[in-house]
Amino acid sequence: MRIAILSQGPELYSTKRLVEAAQLRGHEVHVINPLECYMNINMRQSSIHIGGRELPTFDAVIPRIGASITFYGSAVLRQFEMMGVYALNDSVGISRSRDKLRSMQLMSRRGIGLPITGFANKPSDIPDLIDMVGGAPLVIKLLEGTQGIGVVLAETRKAAESVIEAFMGLKANIMVQEYIKEANGADIRCFVLGDKVIAAMKRQAMPGEFRSNLHRGGTASLVKLTPEERSVAIRAAKTMGLNVAGVDLLRSNHGPVIMEVNSSPGLEGIEGATTKDVAGAIIEFVEKNVTKVKKVTQAQG
């Protein structure tokens, strides 16, 4: 097969591992920066170009689209889809998962466990918003944040009011969530592929830090999932419409709660913690599913 990997970073661990795994299985791989692509959209023969040349035909595309380029990256991916190329994760699923509030709304409708979440627009609603999520301590999140950036733990009501008011004053979109104290600064990353969790790791925050992201100094270790955790992770990925997802959950007193569904999960932490060939499993999944793609894709725009 000829496989395109949409990535701005050919030197990144995840990209290199996918290239390596695909080449080991005899495939031709091209790493393409989506920001360098431009599109010809017409009723006869749509195409994608880079540097004055039309890209060749691909059998499959693996999107590794960063959060900062979601809009343009999704547009490029959608163009591949409209040209009949199999997308490991499609543009609709990626767009859903990148909108944190929409993700929460979709999962709540499916009855998936979540932290109590509040969203408001007016400063006059702040007191009731805080009460809705159970009061302080609580977590305040920028909807556009990634890797723990833009996430604040407000330990007192006064601090919560001040931070929320400041974000609102900056016209920043935020959501407010209950603080799951019993998680003790740890979360679980479930790596979902198709209808299975193929790997999982526990991420523990540094002392004095509540964010467990590995980019913020958290440590990763093996973890054994309960059947309920495995099931809820798969349901969360399916709700987003993703074939590949990093589903982050916390162990709360009332069962697992989903914090986020990541459509472009990193491979370094999960492969390091579990010693599993996650990249190889992804390429194998593409091989099995690429023949099922229809000439007219299911992308809804």
From Swiss-Prot:
A molecular function (GO) term: ribosomal S6-glutamic acid ligase activity
Top-level enzyme category: ligase
Residue sites binding Mg(2+) 1 per the record: 248, 260
SUPFAM superfamilies from the UniProt entry: Glutathione synthetase ATP-binding domain-like (SSF56059)
Free-text remark on how the cofactor is bound: Binds 2 magnesium or manganese ions per subunit.
GO biological process: protein modification process; SOS response; translation
Binding site for ATP: 141, 178-179, 187, 211-213
Domain of life: Bacteria
Lipoprotein among keywords: no
Keywords assigned: ATP-binding, Ligase, Magnesium, Manganese, Metal-binding, Nucleotide-binding, Protein biosynthesis
Record-stated family: Belongs to the RimK family.
Protein name: Probable alpha-L-glutamate ligase 2
Lineage: Bacteria, Pseudomonadati, Pseudomonadota, Gammaproteobacteria, Alteromonadales
Encoding gene (name): rimK2
